[in-house]
Amino acid sequence: EVVGRLRPTAFREFWEFTVEKVAVNAVMAGARPEYLPVILAHAASGVSARSSSTTSFACYSVINGPIRSEIGMSDGIGAMGPHNHANVSIGRAYNLLSVNLQGGSEPGDTYMGSLGNPMNYALTFPEAEERSPWQPLHVQRGFKAEDSTVSVFFGGRYHIAGFGPRETWAEQFKRAIAACQHNLPPTLIVDPITTRQFV
């Protein structure tokens, strides 16, 4: 049974694939069997983790709902780094299936990112729903709190910033946001400790 299809560029044919093909890539990524529902959701999204654009934009994904804790994902210290097996191997599986099940990701042929992007490797993390002052992303998008979801985003550039002393950070933050392209609004990934400053 076909569970998804991907292609490296808009000018190439789609490749269709089965659960077995997705599972093979999950095993190659070091994923445990209990991660497969999340990896299958990535595969079924139809969005490749490997874009073919000279801007080198990359995908990242946010996991919501009960599955986050059921499979041991981390939304705390090091959640976006190489420290949690579930976070990293799910992201790596998404990357591998995007290469192997879409017809390749060959630089100069099916991959045209000029310099590439380190975010292409494995950026998957859960939202810290319990520590956020806002509704979880999936609830904002119309899902129930008890639903488990995968949301895939594209990002061209990324900026990791600390905005200095408490007295001046708000003004510096406003300037940083104002510098973003208006037709490409930013996605803010904010530590739960910092969110208290927003509410």
Residue ranges of predicted features:
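Non-transmembrane, aqueous-exposed alpha-helical and coiled segments at domain scale
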Residues: 1-199
